[in-house]
From Swiss-Prot:
Species whose genome carries this gene: Arabidopsis thaliana
Protein name: MATH domain and coiled-coil domain-containing protein At3g27040
Alphabetically ordered keywords of this record: Coiled coil
Domain MATH: 7-133
Regions crossing the membrane: none
Family matches, as PROSITE patterns: MATH
Secretion signal span: none
Coiled coil: 230-271
InterPro entries (UniProt xref): MATH-CC_domain_protein (IPR050804), MATH/TRAF_dom (IPR002083), TRAF-like (IPR008974)
A Pfam family hit: MATH_2
Source domain of life: Eukaryota
Length: 271
């Protein structure tokens, strides 16, 4: 089965139609109106009605809170794949809840119309359906949490809560991100989150930081500098903080070496 999603629309391509049996088939889960949905079809009808049955359902409804409800306008289009051909559409408004998680049409389309070679609904063994879901009302919890607002700061998508911190970094350390090489926004976001987190850690008082915190900050610093960030001030801050804890770090390292030696001895004994 092929699937494609864009905004409120979801395209479902049912492949190898002729080899399908009389049972049901499901599409992948998709999102519309911050809710999850799934299509259910009986492509060959049943033993009584010679129609293509098509439904939309709420997947994993048992995980939603008691009393949930949602109302949606649903449109199904059986796509005519011949250029200029007339597609067939059905639409309705439904309430979905704990008792009624599935709605649709038992007579979406005559099987004889689909199976006819000159009608354009079955091409190369594929039937194409477009579902459009407009969520009108939701009672209870949404499936998809709302993502926090992000604002563009010098080419970086920054959460609204961190705009002030990011502006401060660019004002104090101009050009610190001018040579970053990843162009993908997801990668840039990941690197930026690491820089902001590391900045917050190193702004704490030295006595508030453990050796583990410093080790993580060092690893993070190496990670982001390899991506092109120029973070001289963070490197300086890490060195200053680390030197004030040098004796403690040496003691921790000594303990680790003793533990490693003990583990090596245990392995030798077990072998």
């Amino acid at each position: 089965m092929g699937n494609h999603q864009a905004d409120k629309k979801f395209t479902w391509v049912i492949k190898n139609y002729n080899s399908l049996g009389s049972g049901s088939v499901y599409s992948d889960t998709f999102k519309a109106g911050r809710c999850k949905w799934r299509l259910l079809a009986f492509p060959k009808g049943n033993n009584i009605y010679d129609y293509f049955f098509l439904y939309i359902c709420v997947p994993n409804s048992e995980s939603l809170p008691s009393g949930w409800r949602r109302r949606a306008k649903v449109s199904f289009t059986m796509v005519n794949q011949i250029p200029g051909g007339l597609s067939q559409q059905r639409e309705a408004v439904y309430w979905f809840d704990e008792k009624d998680t599935t709605h649709g049409f038992e007579s979406m389309f005559l099987l004889s119309e689909i199976q006819s070679s000159d009608k354009g609904f079955l091409v190369n063994g594929e039937v194409k359906i477009v579902a459009e879901v407009d969520v009108l009302e939701v009672i209870g919890e949404l499936d998809v949490p709302e993502e926090p607002e992000r604002i563009d700061i010098n080419g970086f998508q920054v959460p609204a809560s961190q705009v002030e911190s990011m502006n401060s970094l660019f004002e104090k350390y101009r050009g610190f991100a001018s040579k970053i090489f990843p162009k993908n926004q997801h990668l840039r976001k990941t690197f930026l989150d690491v820089v902001l987190s590391m900045t917050e850690i190193l702004c704490k008082f030295p006595e508030e930081l453990s050796s583990g915190d410093l080790a993580e900050a060092y690893s993070a610093l190496r990670f982001v500098t390899k991506a092109g960030f120029k973070l001289d001030w963070l490197e300086k801050k890490l060195k200053e903080t680390g030197k004030s804890r040098l004796q403690e770090i040496e003691e921790d390292l000594k303990d680790l070496k003793v533990k490693c030696a003990d583990m090596d001895a245990l392995l030798d004994f077990l072998r």
